[in-house]
């Protein structure tokens, strides 16, 4: 017997292949069906609590809570915010296709646009707001070692989160500056966080 496990970063999003184009152009029905199975698989493999970033997580959370389906306890963000040509943007596809169907990324640029996007996301009743402060290394201009969201953009999202009291989760891969900006403006969770300096740790 062992206690239930916690996974603080996953995506219920389909992804039957490792091709980021397939992730986007697969049908909505496939995304949803795979997401339901992925949620159930988490529970049967010992994960009793998960933090989910994706298009279907909020709906699955609600269905689990209502007893309609079985799954773990889910803390869901809905789609996370990245910059255009960032980690949540499949660059081989037309931008509108990515905006309409990306499984976990919403492409938003600029502080005021991000403020509005946070307010729109709040209408979906998420448990947290997710940003990609860095890339993830999927393609040439998606470096996980560079801060891809500006200081002003990170602060704008953090300020909006503080207004309502919703937690901010920040994807910060291998960038000291992205981690520092995220934490100093109020991010409660750093996702990955492989590169941290002393001043960030002190915060």
Model segments located where?
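Mid-domain alpha/beta scaffold segments of enzyme catalytic cores
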Residues: 53-98, 104-108
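Active-site glycine- and acidic-residue-rich loops that bind
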Residues: 54-56, 105-119, 188-198
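Metal-associated gating/positioning segment near the N- to mid-region
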Residues: 2-66, 84-90, 152, 177, ...
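Divalent metal-dependent hydrolysis catalytic cores, especially in the metallo-beta-lactamase
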Residues: 32-60, 71-80, 126-139, 166-167, ...
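Extended, non-globular alpha-helical segments
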Residues: 113-127, 131-132
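Active-site core of metal-dependent hydrolases
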Residues: 132-203
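Active-site mouth loops of central-metabolism enzymes
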Residues: 20-33, 92-117, 167-172
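Aromatic/hydrophobic pocket-lining residues that form π-stacking "cages" and hydrophobic walls in ligand
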Residues: 38, 60-63, 117, 154-157, ...
């Amino acid at each position: 017997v062992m206690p239930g496990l916690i996974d603080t970063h996953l995506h219920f999003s389909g992804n039957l292949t490792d091709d980021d184009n397939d992730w986007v152009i697969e049908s909505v029905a496939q995304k949803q069906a795979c997401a339901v199975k992925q949620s159930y698989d988490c529970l049967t493999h010992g994960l009793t609590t998960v933090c989910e970033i994706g298009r279907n997580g909020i709906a699955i959370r609600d269905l689990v809570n209502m007893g309609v389906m079985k799954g773990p306890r889910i803390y869901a963000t809905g789609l996370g915010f990245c910059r255009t040509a960032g980690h949540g943007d499949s660059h081989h596809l037309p931008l509108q296709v990515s905006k309409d169907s990306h499984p976990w990324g919403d492409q938003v640029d600029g502080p005021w646009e991000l403020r509005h996007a946070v307010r729109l996301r709040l209408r979906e009743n998420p448990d947290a707001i997710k940003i990609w402060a860095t890339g993830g290394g999927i393609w040439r201009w998606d470096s996980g070692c560079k801060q891809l969201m500006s200081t002003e953009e990170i602060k704008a999202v953090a300020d909006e989160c503080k207004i309502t009291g919703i937690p901010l989760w920040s994807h910060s891969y291998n960038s000291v500056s992205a981690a520092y900006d995220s934490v100093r403006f109020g991010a409660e969770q750093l996702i990955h966080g492989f590169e941290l300096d002393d001043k960030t740790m002190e915060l």
